[in-house]
């Protein structure tokens, strides 16, 4: 048997106010009398109430959620990228939904469709090459799209990364300019 989810009406009854007053307090605490707000806050704390963000998401068409697709949980680079993203999103009260597609374009496509179904406010992709269907879904979603890593090729919206070919070219030119024709590494 499923437990009863605590509702705004439950809080209103316990606080001796209307459901609308509780709703107003959750949205904008300063719009409610200080004493009333303190009473509502105390009750919410006592009963461990967690507001349901779904109605606000529907009303405002904003979820405060970003989708992130990474190709591997095994690569430390992506763990560092996720940590960097989280350090910014958490400060701005955004949540992240993370999907791993294991370098498989069809899996990436399914993950993009799934993330878009959560009404995400933006999406971060780890690569530049996607299925035609993925590109169509992303373009029709009209949300910000950021592609990470390699910046070669046509971008969907925004990109953050580097050009591997140009970096290799610059490296070889520098080596030749310095007359350094051999580079070795102590591979551990």
Question: Which role does the model predict for each range below?
Answer:
Residues 67-69, 182-185:
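Short hydrophobic beta-strand segments
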Residues 11, 183-188:
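Conserved small/polar residues in nucleotide/adenosyl-binding loops
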Residues 1-6, 61-173, 177:
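Alpha-helical recognition/docking segments in bacterial nutrient-uptake
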Residues 1-62:
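N-terminal helix-turn-helix DNA-binding module of bacterial transcription factors
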Residues 32, 51, 71, 76, ...:
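Proline-centered helix-kink/hinge sites
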């Amino acid at each position: 048997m499923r437990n009863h989810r605590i509702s705004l009406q439950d809080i209103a009854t316990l606080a001796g106010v209307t459901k609308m007053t509780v709703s107003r307090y959750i949205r904008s605490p300063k719009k409610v009398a200080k004493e009333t707000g303190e009473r509502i806050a105390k009750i919410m704390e006592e009963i461990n109430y967690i507001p349901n963000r779904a109605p606000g998401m529907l009303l405002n068409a904003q979820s405060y959620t970003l989708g992130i697709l990474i190709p591997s949980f095994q690569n430390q680079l992506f763990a560092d990228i996720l940590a960097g993203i989280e350090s910014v999103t958490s400060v701005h009260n955004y949540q992240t939904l993370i999907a791993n597609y294991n370098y498989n374009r069809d899996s990436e496509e399914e993950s993009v469709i799934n993330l878009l179904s959560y009404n995400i406010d933006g999406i971060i992709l780890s690569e530049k090459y996607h299925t035609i269907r993925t590109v169509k879904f992303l373009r029709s979603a009209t949300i910000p799209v950021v592609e990470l890593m390699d910046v070669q090729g046509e971008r969907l919206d925004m990109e953050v990364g580097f050009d591997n070919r140009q970096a290799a070219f610059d490296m070889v030119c520098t080596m030749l300019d310095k007359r350094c024709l051999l580079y070795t590494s102590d591979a551990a």
